Amino acid sequence: MPDICLYKVKRNIFTMLTTPPLTTGVLATLQDLGITTRQDLRQIGAIKTFLLLKAAGRTITRSTLWQLEALSHGIRPQDLSEAEKTVLLKQLADHPPVAVFPRPSEMENFMRIALEQAAQSAAAGEIPVGAAVVKNGSVIAAAHNTCIQSRDVSRHAEISALAQAGAVLGNYRLDGCDVYVTLEPCVMCASALIQARVARVIFGADEPKTGAAGSIIDLFAAHGINKHTAVTGGILEKECRTLLQQFFREKRRFQP
């Protein structure tokens, strides 16, 4: 009997999302986002799924949030209490920005441009970090770490790339821009990216010592200061990390 019950639970979790209760339009957008089963919904969460639908351009109301939450728990929307709905709305208001990110192949292409910049840093004896700013599918700025050369602690790749992009656009606010960077941003750079109102930040390798996108702190998840910028990582992570490791290995090799 326990095995049969376990089978039923697993079967229910993997049940395909259907209409009703979801509308055909919502269902189609969820499929485009790769959210097709109750397991997908439970893994991502009703609130983030709701925000992804909005980020994908779907016009939805609170009733869709109730439907998603109910589906994730295997109950009917009308079974949600008013207290549960109030909690959901509070969590929705506090949730960090969510975005639909480009296809992996597209993100990898732009990250390679950032990697080319990072290689220039390495060649100059600087810590190899590179960044690229993309708007409407085109690179409008690219830069690398030049702290030693410029004798300026603020000359991280992201800061220089933001300055270049601001000059190109004639505005320090980079609405609709994406920033690709080979290493998880530090607190200084994360703050600058948020203040520039960058739409999406895509980084390569995480930085366990100073990373401010989840490693030691997550500024992007601080709703009070971040209302515009979504973040994701791990794009060409191996290549980005290898470049850093090779740089420090060579540096130790030639130290007296």
How would you name each of these model-derived features?
Residues 17-33, 48-49, 54-62:
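Helix-hairpin-helix
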